[in-house]
Structure formats: structure tokens, C-alpha cells
Amino acid sequence: MSYNQKFLSHLQNFWINHEIKRFSWALGRIIEELPNFQVFQVIPNHEDEPWVYVSSGIGQFLGQEFFIISPFETPEHIETLAMLASASMHYPDQFQLGKTINIGRPWVEQSSFQHFLISLPYPYGQELEYMDNVRFFWLLPITQPERLFLNTHSVEDLETRFDERGIDYLDINRPSVI
């Protein structure tokens, strides 16, 4: 069984009864770096469920994959995951749990958030987090003040503030917790 087939099986076991689509990205250096790279899109069954986009291909090399949770469908997330997968192959130390990533543009149109925090998959737990020796990390959109807060505070301090405020991570312009 190929990595992507095993990967899809892991997603199907987690998101039972959800349609899951597979996408490739054919632009840029990722074609040479990760020729089997794909993004899987988990389609919500209900209006109140998010869209989920999951990278597939870097886990074979770095032992981790990333996912984005979105309030709506957009191909931007496929491009973002391809861009980050490529960058992670060149700068693996910058793509570890607790690090932040500046993606250079809003994570979705009409949002002011241009940074992701590489986080544990809190909305889904350990059942999704592990597939053999591969871990799944959540790319949580954060505000610029939240990113700057991490210069002097721990990720746990920021996560405590998220918990205390009960952030709506699907609100593309949620208030900063800082």
C-alpha cells in the first residue's frame, strides 16, 4: 500500500461517512521535491462543520503532516499546504511543534491573519494525531500580536489565553487574545 493510500485510509477511519477529495499541486519546486505530494480535502456533512485540508507526502521524510481547518472551501489552502510542504523540506527546524509561520498573505481572503501556529490537533485529539510514526499538526491561524507574544512567552501561555477566551478558530477575523 502506498503512503497516500495508507494516509487516505487513516483519514477515512477518522472522518467516517465524509467525502474526501484528493488534490495535487503542479506548480513550483514541489514537483521535484515531493512528486507524490497531495492534499486531501475533508468535506463537511453539515453546515456547522468545517472544511479540513490535510497535506500528504512530507510525513515520509519528516515524520509530520499539517492540516488547516477552514470555515469554507477554498483552493488557497491547497496552495498553502504545498508551499509549506516545500519549505519544510528545506527548513525542517522551522516547521516543528510550537513554531510560527508567516505565509506572506492572509490565510483566507478578507482575513488579517498571516501567521500559523504549528499546534497539536486539539479539535480532533490523539486519534487523528498519530499514524504510525507520523504526527499531524494543526496550522492554527494567529494574529500578529499573538505571534509577537510568543517572543517573550511560551506556547502554553498563549494556549491558556485561547482556552480562557474560548476562541472561535473558524472566525477569520476573531479578536486577538493579546
Predicted regions and their residues:
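Acidic, proline/glycine-rich low-complexity IDRs
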Residues: 1-178
